[in-house]
Amino acid sequence: MHPNVPAWRLSAAALLLALAALPAAAADKPCNDAGKSIDGVTTWAALAKAMHDYGHCDKGPTAEVFTEAILRVIISGWPKIADAGPILEKDAAFKNWLAKRLSSPDLSPQDTAEIRDLAKASCPKGQDKVCGELLSSVEMGRAISSPDLLLLQPLTPAPAPAKKP
């Protein structure tokens, strides 16, 4: 068919419309299996895969299961924190999603404190970048949930003005 033939234009338009709908349909895995799949996550690779498979379901009860998985991978899996580096470096979408989740004011103060303490005091050798990214995210969340933390007081009082003789 030739592009000037009206039937060709209609066929091309229908094809483009069908192709435009494919990515959206492929990205939307049903959320009814999300909780079960995410609940079994224990590694950084599995967490990244779960985010890609079910990130669109990250709300309501599924968000709670995602939070539990994140905490399980970071806190319980701290000895394997080195596995996070290559994944965070290669997968910007996962890195941004994780930073957003860790900086959420919905994360409990106890959990953010535990992640902060691990990142500050127990960062394995060579993992400074990963620890810094985790620390930065949870600190951002603390600042959002407790804005008074942003009101820093000077460490020493300002010097008194010099007296004129």
Which residues make up each language-model segment?
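N-terminal secretory signal peptides
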Residues: 27-67
